[in-house]
Structures are given as structure tokens and as C-alpha cells.
UniProtKB/Swiss-Prot annotation:
Native source organism of the sequence: Crotalus durissus collilineatus (Brazilian rattlesnake)
GO CC terms in record: extracellular region
Location in or out of the cell: Secreted
CDD domains found in the cross-reference section: PLA2c (cd00125)
Name used for this protein in its record: Phospholipase A2 crotoxin basic chain
Reactions catalysed: a 1,2-diacyl-sn-glycero-3-phosphocholine + H2O = a 1-acyl-sn-glycero-3-phosphocholine + a fatty acid + H(+)
Record text on subunit structure and interactions: Heterodimer of one acidic (CA also named crotapotin) and one basic (CB) subunits; non-covalently linked.
UniProt record, GO biological process: arachidonate secretion; lipid catabolic process; negative regulation of T cell proliferation; phospholipid metabolic process
Tissue spec: Expressed by the venom gland.
Length: 122
């Protein structure tokens, strides 16, 4: 669920997802095209690919079980979809933490019109 993903991002990065990641680069937020702009944008690209493999799941709105303990995100038991969505979100949040040192404020609200060219394959 998007609200749960926001909590994971905040846990890992100490930042709310909105606005820092809602419109970042070419892949953070809704949709995406072109080449990822940097490591942060690549985290979002990989997250989009992860969700893309879950076409039969309601990736943005399904609630799942997870815990935030001792500095780690742990996904809990649930339906197959819930567990997979949680893993996509967990991996992305951890990726965003690893990419904090290269975060560029110039990409924070990046116009879609500047995301040109073919998208990479997942």
C-alpha cells in the first residue's frame, strides 16, 4: 500500500516520500520512461519493474503486514500478492537509503518532458 511504502521510505531515509521522491527523476512516482537519471531514480525504476511482475496484484492499494524493528524492515505473512508487494517496497526503501549520498535536488520535481528515449528493459 502506498501509505505503508511511505512509512518504509521514512524509516530508511528519515524523509517523507512526498515531496522528495514523489516526482523525482524519470521513474519515481506514477509511470516512467527514458533512462533513470541517477541511483535514486534507478531504485524507482527497479521498484516499477518489481510491481510490473505483479500484474494480477493491486500493488498500490493492497495492505500487507510488516514490522520496523532494530533498524530492519521485515515483511510478514499474508497472501502471495501481499508478501510480494511488501518485498518490492522493502527493497526499494533500502535502495533509496543507499542512494541518499547521490540524491540531487535538481531531480526532485523533474518534468516528464525531459525523460526521453526508450525505456530500459527490466
Amino acid at each position: 500500500h502506498l501509505l505503508q511504502f511511505n512509512k518504509m521510505i521514512k524509516f530508511e531515509t528519515r524523509r517523507n516520500a512526498i515531496p522528495p521522491y514523489a516526482f523525482y527523476g524519470c521513474y519515481c512516482g506514477w509511470g516512467g520512461r527514458g533512462r533513470p537519471k541517477d541511483a535514486t531514480d534507478r531504485c524507482c525504476f527497479v521498484h516499477d519493474c518489481c510491481y510490473g511482475k505483479l500484474a494480477k496484484c493491486n500493488t498500490k492499494w493492497d495492505f500487507y503486514r510488516y514490522s520496523l524493528k532494530s533498524g530492519y524492515i521485515t515483511c510478514g505473512k499474508g497472501t502471495w500478492c501481499e508478501e510480494q508487494i511488501c518485498e518490492c517496497d522493502r527493497v526499494a526503501a533500502e535502495c533509496l537509503r543507499r542512494s541518499l549520498s547521490t540524491y540531487r535536488y535538481g531531480y526532485m520535481i523533474y518534468p516528464d518532458s525531459r525523460c526521453r528515449g526508450p525505456s530500459e528493459t527490466c
